[in-house]
């Protein structure tokens, strides 16, 4: 808790993103006080994400109601760190996962958060040495959403009423997929607008990476005086386009635009880069119904 508190200090050496390249911290089952402290991981740097679990290692199995109460508390703490006061953007670089289970084929017998599953699959999808997301390793939707490593889920069934309540609280849960398997119906951030693409865990992580790329572009061109403002804008945009080429498994359309505000022009030494990301919404709700006809009606068509 003491170490992670340094992320709230903008004078800490942890703000040196050239050397401290971490993007995400996973809650491995810390006590509540430490979970609260982990929320500060995203307080200063916009290239970071925190994934929290309701489970505490060594603690009792929680009920669905207890999971929900903890999720509300954790989401409230995360809301201390909005994305932008200027634009009024609420926090989205955080996620809360409920329930607990055991690790399959492991000597570690304590219960753990299903975040263990998320961490393993995220590393396999997004953790390559070249930084490119691996096609075929995504875990949004089956088969990737089906749990491979965690079993004996603490709350194996979540009713519709409870699911709606958990969703409103920003809580992710695990439920039955078939007779043998469980799955994540979705992995949503704590962002408070269900219609926004910022609800998606993967989209949020892409935005974290885009913030890293933008800072690398600044490091590359900082101090340049041999380019006109127009030439510099083109160079910065091309730098970003090259950096994102092939990175995100063809999931997004990304458009950088460097321009100069009136304040930039007056100063003469600054510019503004806007990076647009176009992403798909998560599919989470399906309405279905059955229509019955006479066979003769089919034959007639």
Name what the model sees in each region:
Residues 1-232, 239-260:
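A glycine- and small-residue-enriched flexible loop/hinge signal that marks low-structured segments
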Residues 234, 245-301:
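Compositionally biased, low-complexity/repeat regions
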